[in-house]
């Protein structure tokens, strides 16, 4: 499953995650683009995924049509937009189906009142003007927003339902398409997300393309989606800004000794909380630990009073893909000082790591694995694609040559190539994990060489009907567990034998349970527990997405059926934990979901200390770094987080980060959040 939060392009940034509330308009009832319609394509390095068209209707309204299949996730939508004299949307209607269900959405202005209804929310605004940014809709329709931002200049424009956006112009670049060379310019849009969104304009300052892991480009320019010059320029523009932020925090003064006194200390090695402790960090290491008041502060040291607060090791997100430079900065602000990135392109991983080591990027320490998938229409974008056992082994060797940590096999892999690929990876000292390929059961993947199973739905595949297992490289990997998990007997002899073998082999599980809480249980309209504490502090657009619903209901299943299946998923975590199967906490999201992941582990029977170990010492052990980090112990690296509250009683206190120490550098969390684009503290 890929619930990527990179949101590199504006098209992804405003896509809905909403539950179907009524039967969506069928594909054959949607608008049909005429000959001569402006044509865009959606592509990645895995190939073409879809088409988007735009044309003008006889009455002057603008129509859009989007048709896409991304690894089996279907989008069939249309949109009609009416603009007023100022070029702002006066009326918008969206129809069809997205991967998350019914895409229906309407917006209209009557007099001074604007009203909207989407699958995420509904509301109105009386007297406030602005550009209505759909919760979903056809991505290309946001070309109108770009036009308005260009016309507005530095002042920007107000957004509806709320927010304010601006556009800044960057450098030009000459590219070549089917009609010859073309000059385009890079721009950044702010106010949509907490970080800028980059896109490209043509020579007339009109929207031209989004280029990223998934790109939207004009037909005839498909090749530019993987043009190194475009990606390099995008990265360089962002890198310049984040470099100045990194230098602001990574100062000599920030590396001075620091003494935390009168703190509640979490000993991750023993899994206990110790009251009224003192911890001294010096020269990037933990120098001393003792009773409060027992450690003298060295000359030039900073002393922090920790009364009412808890000092924990630097937090790990064991499933957080390296996104843009801003997302990794936000994770530092949330106390994530180390992370595993299970599926990152080699060049991106090497660039980010190099800039981190040089002090140009504020990012936790990454442990990166690379996707390997069979060349197939359903292959993962960003993967090294293979066509045989030999090319699988070659891909594994390429990952090792890059100096990265592991390989992550994906759902379209030929099962016959897993064992030889895993054997080569182990010979080279690489970690092997991933989704379980279609037609394989998880125990078969483990026997073939998996050290770890990624995502709990693939663990649940052990008990799924064969027709679900056979299509695990499609939406069946979500819909199967959503439909059938509720009926699984977790205590059956077969499942008990399964748990025992996972334990015996030392197999690790990366549950990402928080994903399934969102996809299986949510009706929409209110923020999920993972996001509620962040409402109002990141961006208005994300606030709307945080109120989205779950995966669309299929066949005759109800949301209550899905909720029962999620309860069984929580039960599966409980059974794995009781059987002694090690688990590491990850999000496959923004990172802000991590605390909710830990809260769900407590629901599954973990103690708060055990849950916190899954995000500290346990992942450090998995990556082989536990001798130097993962716990607060004398001689280890000074990776620590001071949070407001008693974590032993309330894991939610982990959201209230006060101070972050990464490799001995002391940083104020309020300043980090501000730099990352947050407007306040999570609740």
Model segments located where?
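N-terminal cleavable signal peptides for secretion/export
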Residues: 22-80, 91-106, 151-177, 220, ...
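Solvent-exposed helix/loop surface patches that form functional interfaces
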Residues: 25-28, 32-35, 102-185, 232-237
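Contiguous hydrophobic, core-forming segments of folded domains
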Residues: 74-142, 193-204, 208-220
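Acidic, glycine-enriched loop/beta-strand segments at the rims
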Residues: 248-250, 265-278, 291-293, 607-612, ...
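Histidine-rich, glycine-flanked metal-binding segment
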Residues: 270-312
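Divalent metal-dependent hydrolysis catalytic cores, especially in the metallo-beta-lactamase
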Residues: 329-350, 365-371, 400-413, 422, ...
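Active-site neighborhoods of metal-dependent hydrolases
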Residues: 395-413, 459-604, 677-683
């Amino acid at each position: 499953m890929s619930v990527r939060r990179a949101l590199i392009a504006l098209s992804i940034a405003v896509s809905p995650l909403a539950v179907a509330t009524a039967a969506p308009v069928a594909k054959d009832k949607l608008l049909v683009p005429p000959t001569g319609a402006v044509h865009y394509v959606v592509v990645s390095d895995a190939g073409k995924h879809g088409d988007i068209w735009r044309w003008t209707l006889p009455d002057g309204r603008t129509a859009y049509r989007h048709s896409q299949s991304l690894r089996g996730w279907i989008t069939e939508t249309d949109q009609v937009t009416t603009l007023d004299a100022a070029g702002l949307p006066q009326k918008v209607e969206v129809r069809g189906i997205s991967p998350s269900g019914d895409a229906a959405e309407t917006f209209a202005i009557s007099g001074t009142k604007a009203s909207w209804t989407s699958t995420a929310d509904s509301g109105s605004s009386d007297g406030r003007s602005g550009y209505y940014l759909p919760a979903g809709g056809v991505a290309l329709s946001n070309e109108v927003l770009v036009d308005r931002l260009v016309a507005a200049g530095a002042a920007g424009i107000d957004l509806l339902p709320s927010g304010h956006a601006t556009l800044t112009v960057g450098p030009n670049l000459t590219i070549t398409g089917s009609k010859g060379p073309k000059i385009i310019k890079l721009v950044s849009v702010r106010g949509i997300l907490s970080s800028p969104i980059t896109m490209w304009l043509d020579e007339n300052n009109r929207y031209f393309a989004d280029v990223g892991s998934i790109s939207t480009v004009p037909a005839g320019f498909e090749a530019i989606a993987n043009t190194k010059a475009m990606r390099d320029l995008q990265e360089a523009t962002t890198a310049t800004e984040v470099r100045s932020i990194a230098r602001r925090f990574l100062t000599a003064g920030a590396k001075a000794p620091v003494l935390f006194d009168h703190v509640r200390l979490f000993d991750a090695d023993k899994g206990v909380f110790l009251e009224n402790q003192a911890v001294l960090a010096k020269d990037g290491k933990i120098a001393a630990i003792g009773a409060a008041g027992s450690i003298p502060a060295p000359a030039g040291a900073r002393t922090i009073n920790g009364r009412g607060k808890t000092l924990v090791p630097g937090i790990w997100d064991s499933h957080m893909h390296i996104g843009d430079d801003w997302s990794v900065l936000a994770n530092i602000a949330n106390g994530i000082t180390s992370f595993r990135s299970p599926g990152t392109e080699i060049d991106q991983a090497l660039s980010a790591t190099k800039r981190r080591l040089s002090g140009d990027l504020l990012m936790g320490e990454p442990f990166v694995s690379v996707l390997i998938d069979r060349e197939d229409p359903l292959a993962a974008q960003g993967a090294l694609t293979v066509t045989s056992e030999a090319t699988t082994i070659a891909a594994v060797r390429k990952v090792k040559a890059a100096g990265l940590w592991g390989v992550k096999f994906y759902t379209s892999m030929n099962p016959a190539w897993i064992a030889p690929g895993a054997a080569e990876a182990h010979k080279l000292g690489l970690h092997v994990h991933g989704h379980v390929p279609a037609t394989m059961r998880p125990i078969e993947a483990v026997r073939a060489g998996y050290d770890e199973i990624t995502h709990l739905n693939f663990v649940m595949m052990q008990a799924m009907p064969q027709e679900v297992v056979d299509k695990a490289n499609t939406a069946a990997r979500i819909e199967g567990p959503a439909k059938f998990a509720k009926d699984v007997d977790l205590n059956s002899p077969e499942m008990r034998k399964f748990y025992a073998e996972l334990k015996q082999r030392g197999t690790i599980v990366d549950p990402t349970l928080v994903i399934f809480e969102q996809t299986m249980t949510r009706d929409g309209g209110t923020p999920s527990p993972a996001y509620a504490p962040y409402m109002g502090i990141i961006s208005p657009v994300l606030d709307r997405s945080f109120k989205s619903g779950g995966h669309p209901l299929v066949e005759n299943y109800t949301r209550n059926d899905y909720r029962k299946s999620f309860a069984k998923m929580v039960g599966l975590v409980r059974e794995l934990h009781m059987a002694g199967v090690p688990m590491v906490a990850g999000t496959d999201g923004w990172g802000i979901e991590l605390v909710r992941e830990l809260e769900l582990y407590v629901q599954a029977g973990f103690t708060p200390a055990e849950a916190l170990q899954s995000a500290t010492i346990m992942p450090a052990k998995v990556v082989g770094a536990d001798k130097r980090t993962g716990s607060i112990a004398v001689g280890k690296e000074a990776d620590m987080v001071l949070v407001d509250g008693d974590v032993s009683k309330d894991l939610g206190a982990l959201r209230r980060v006060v101070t972050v120490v990464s490799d001995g550098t002391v940083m104020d969390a309020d300043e980090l959040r501000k730099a990352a684009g947050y407007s306040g503290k999570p609740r």
